[in-house]
Amino acid sequence: MSGQFEASVEIDRPVEAVFAYLADGHNDPDFSPRVQEISKSPEGRTALGTVFRSTVKDAGMKTGREFRIVGFDPPHFIRWTEQSRNLVTAEGGYDLEALPGGRTRVRIFNTLEGHGLGKLLVGFAVGAARKDAPAFGRRIKAAAEASLKR
């Protein structure tokens, strides 16, 4: 069983800058409070094949996550797939679109899939993610605009 959530937001910064901000996974804790720590391999610029390893806290439980970048087209999109075998895993991405006035539309989406016992939990996870999606988009906007000064 699986389900998807998504959010769209307009950021008052140029698409190239927003793409670079989102591609640097070290920024994830700025807008995703569930991310406790994150590392990248190899170091350097994010590219196809880059792996991000993170510790996240969901429903009071800490788990390790490992995501591989499987699609990367600056400044248009980023795609990832989770390689870790947790009860609920994610794959998704960002779509970015340049807007007039040096602004950017960002769409984030994730498909969550349950494995084993996670098949019983994925509905709750998707419901919570959908409920939080608009706020998640606003957190991305606020973090990117605060980090990327005009």
Region locations from a protein language model:
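Hydrophobic pocket/interface hotspot
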Residues: 17-22, 28, 52, 69, ...
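Short, solvent-exposed aromatic-acidic interface loops
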Residues: 83-88, 109-115
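A conserved amphipathic terminal alpha-helix motif
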Residues: 105, 111-150
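Intrinsic-disorder/low-complexity, polar/charged segments enriched in Ser/Thr/Lys/Arg/Asp/Glu/Gln
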Residues: 2-10, 51, 64, 77, ...
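A short, structured loop/turn motif at beta-sheet edges
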Residues: 15-16, 43-46, 70-75, 95-105
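Glycine-rich portal/gate segments that line the openings of hydrophobic small-molecule binding cavities
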Residues: 39-85, 91, 135-150
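Hydrophobic ligand-binding cavity/cleft-lining segments
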Residues: 1-42, 150
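Short loop/turn positions at the edges of beta-strands in beta-sheet-rich folds
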Residues: 11, 84-86, 100
